[in-house]
Design a protein with these regions (language model features):
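Short beta-strand/loop element within the Bergerat-fold HATPase_c
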Residues: 44-56
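Conserved micro-motifs of the catalytic ATP-binding
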Residues: 14, 18-21
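Short conserved segments within the C-terminal catalytic ATPase subdomain
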Residues: 1-11
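Acidic ATP/Mg2+-coordinating residue in the GHKL
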Residues: 64
């Protein structure tokens, strides 16, 4: 319901890159990030997706023009059941819907693939998540199984 009256614009700067990953889990990761971009933005949402090769892997960035995340909240948003303060009060008195599980799931999936996820944001301006996924040639010993 939160998304029904929003105008969403996507720009993609996606290069075709090969990564060793589970496409179903990665699909859920990007669904979650894009859904959050829409949920925590005004009525006119602009989302940019970038992908590019870096040393020993690939970076994928998802950036929006949403409400932003404070520096303090950036420290906790990947923890289970934690939500950014601004997200709780964005829509009506009850805030935007959510349980604080989505970004914890994103982190879990990316780390299980041997990667990393980070956030850069400025309140009232933007949020940008960067995901690093390692090259297929890197060793996968010790990686966690996704449950």
């Amino acid at each position: 319901e939160v998304h029904t009256k929003k105008e969403v614009t996507f720009k993609n700067f996606i290069n075709e890159l090969l990564v060793f990953a589970d496409k179903e889990y990665l699909g859920e990761v990007f669904y979650n990030l894009i859904d959050n971009s829409i949920k925590y933005s005004s009525n006119s949402v602009h989302i940019e997706i970038f992908s590019y090769r870096v040393e020993k892997g690939v970076n994928i960035r998802v950036k929006d023009n949403g409400i932003g995340i404070s520096k303090e909240d950036q420290q906790i948003i990947f923890d289970k059941f934690e939500r950014a303060s601004a997200s709780k009060r964005t829509f009506s008195k009850g805030g935007a819907p959510g349980f604080g599980l989505g970004l914890n799931y994103v982190l879990h999936v990316i780390e299980a693939h041997g990667g990393m996820v980070s956030v850069d944001s400025e309140l009232g301006k933007y949020t940008e998540f960067t995901i690093f996924l390692p090259d297929q040639s890197d060793s996968y010993e010790g990686r966690r199984r996704i449950r």
